[in-house]
């Protein structure tokens, strides 16, 4: 049981990184960026090529992949979402799905649909701590995820750009009147969320030693569930939701329900939307018409 708890926390930390990207973008512009899971996939492939082709150090490759996916996020926002800023929500939603398919099948065209083995960039060392067995890779994934979450919280709460993000999320028109560059703030939000997704992609590709162009579909959807579960638009809620989903999946597998673990996650989404639509940490607010 303790082993499953540890495994669930490690998986949940990656879901939390992904969910944070969803929740930040939604908090700023009320958009569900369904291409977010594919940014995670792009991060994994960028890390793969940097390590495999250039023999780059894993941690350097991780940082470069984060920078590259941050730029990708800004480009997607500028080309796909910014022109639709004042369009209907359904138009933006369809565009997000279109961007998702473009990234997925663009990569299928470029690299093929086959699953690739991620380079063994870090020598695995196993530690047996009583009933719990851990590897250095698992500990590293958990540590990096927690560090990135703490850094995100510091950026949002303590920096000038973080204050701008919070102002835009409350009222973008008022923020603009106060001299805040709304477009730059939204681009920065996409960059942050995409960088976290890129990091998650590299970490998971290393952990499972595999990657393929459609690897972001299921984790992307589950991370969306995590964001809704915790309270979409709320950063601590997204992190909490990620850990809860990771634990649910792990314990479902441990109790012999691995075939139903996806159904359990999506069932949680339906349940939370019926019982508490605002999420665990969210507050029910009536939308003004």
Give the ranges of each region predicted by the language model:
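Inter-helical junctions in multi-pass inner-membrane proteins, predominant
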Residues: 1-14, 134, 155-156, 160, ...
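Short, non-helical or kinked segments that cap or interrupt transmembrane helices
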Residues: 22-44, 58, 86-91, 161-164, ...
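Hydrophobic alpha-helical transmembrane segments of polytopic membrane proteins
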Residues: 17, 69, 222-245, 267-275, ...
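Membrane-embedded helix boundary and interhelical linker motif in transport proteins
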Residues: 6, 28-75, 79, 255
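Alpha-helical transmembrane segments within multi-pass membrane transporters and channels
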Residues: 22, 56-99, 106, 240-245, ...
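Transmembrane helix-bundle core of multi-pass membrane transporters
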Residues: 84-158, 185, 251, 256, ...
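Helix-loop-helix "hairpin" substructures at the membrane interface of multi-pass membrane proteins
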Residues: 129, 133-211, 235-241
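Membrane-interfacial amphipathic/re-entrant helices at transmembrane-helix boundaries
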Residues: 1-18, 46, 56-61, 87-91, ...
């Amino acid at each position: 049981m303790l082993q499953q708890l540890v495994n669930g926390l490690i998986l949940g930390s990656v879901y939390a990184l992904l969910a944070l990207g969803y929740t930040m973008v939604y908090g700023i512009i009320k958009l569900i960026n369904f291409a977010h899971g594919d940014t995670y996939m792009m991060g994994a492939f960028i890390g793969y090529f940097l390590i495999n082709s250039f023999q780059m150090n894993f941690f350097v490759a991780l940082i470069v992949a984060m920078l590259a996916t941050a730029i990708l996020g800004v480009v997607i926002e500028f080309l796909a979402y910014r022109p639709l800023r004042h369009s209907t929500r359904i138009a933006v939603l369809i565009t997000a799905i279109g961007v998702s398919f473009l990234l997925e099948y663009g990569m299928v065209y470029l690299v093929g649909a086959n699953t690739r083995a991620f380079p063994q960039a870090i020598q695995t060392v196993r530690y047996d701590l009583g009933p719990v067995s851990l590897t250095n890779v698992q500990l590293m994934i958990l540590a990096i995820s927690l560090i990135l979450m703490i850094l995100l919280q510091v950026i949002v709460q303590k920096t000038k750009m973080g204050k701008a993000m919070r102002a835009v999320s409350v009222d973008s028109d008022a923020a603009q009147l106060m001299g805040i560059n709304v477009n730059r703030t939204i681009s920065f939000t996409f960059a942050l969320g995409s960088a976290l997704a890129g990091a998650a992609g590299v970490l998971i590709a290393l952990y499972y030693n595999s990657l393929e162009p459609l690897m972001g579909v299921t984790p992307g959807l589950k991370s969306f569930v995590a964001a809704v579960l915790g309270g979409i638009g709320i950063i601590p809620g997204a992190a909490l939701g990620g850990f809860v989903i990771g634990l649910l999946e792990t314990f479902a597998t441990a109790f012999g329900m691995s075939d139903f673990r996806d159904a359990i996650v999506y069932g949680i989404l339906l349940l939370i939307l019926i019982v508490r639509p605002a999420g665990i940490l969210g507050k029910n607010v009536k939308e003004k018409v």
